[in-house]
Amino acid sequence: MELTSKQRAQLRGLANSIDTILIVGKDGIGENMLKQANDALEARELIKGRVLENALMSAREVADQLAPLTRSEVVQVIGTKFVLYRPSHRKDKKDKIVLVQDKKKAAK
């Protein structure tokens, strides 16, 4: 799923109010980190992460590696923080994020 610029802007706005829940340290991305990211994405759809200063990777590198492993999209990377999005497949989730549709694509 490729996000449009309008959808990215919408998700960036939503990400402003959420707390950082993933913290990547010097150990990098391990199985526990991957499980935590997958669980959080399924429950919340939009998650914010942070890379500590002692980490061996940059926030861009972490986001670019986590996205394909979690089947998510990188929404934003600023400094040591990153935001990932993946639509939830849970049927019991009441407050799903509804992305704006691009008018040009919808007309096709």
Where are the predicted features?
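Positively charged, polar, low-complexity stretches
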Residues: 1-108
